[in-house]
Amino acid sequence: PPSGVSLWAELPGAQVVLGDRLVLNCAVAAGTGPLSFSWHRGGSGAPLATGARLELRHAGHNDSGHYQCRVSDGDSAAESDPLNVTVLGERDPRAGAEP
């Protein structure tokens, strides 16, 4: 059975600015046979997506929450610990501009 499921964000602290892109990755330490990955938010039963990678192309306020990755080998499944994703407010149009 799959075990050691880990989940991480490509941005520090799993924080993303509203409208920016966020990528989450999932990996499994042990498991044999074909493995399937599914993504869940807030304990929802229906998967958001499948595959070892979840990409939110334009993060919105409703994308904040706890994400989990579930890995299954067809017979049994294991889940990652929840990762809290925070979508921050509007990007400051002055950011990066010279004073």
Language model features with spans:
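Extracellular/luminal immunoglobulin-like beta-sandwich modules
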Residues: 1, 68-91
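Surface-exposed, proline-enriched loop/turn segments that connect beta strands in immunoglobulin-like
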Residues: 7-13, 41-43, 95-98
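A short beta-strand segment in extracellular, disulfide-stabilized domains
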Residues: 15, 20-28
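Short, flexible loop/turn segments at beta-strand junctions in immunoglobulin-like
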Residues: 15, 57-60
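Surface-exposed loops/turns
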Residues: 18, 50, 61-64
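Conserved Ig-like domain signature around the intradomain disulfide
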Residues: 22-24, 35-37, 62-74
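Solvent-exposed loop segments of extracellular immunoglobulin-like
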Residues: 28-43
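Short beta-strand segments within Ig-like beta-sandwich modules, predominantly Fibronectin type-III
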Residues: 43-53
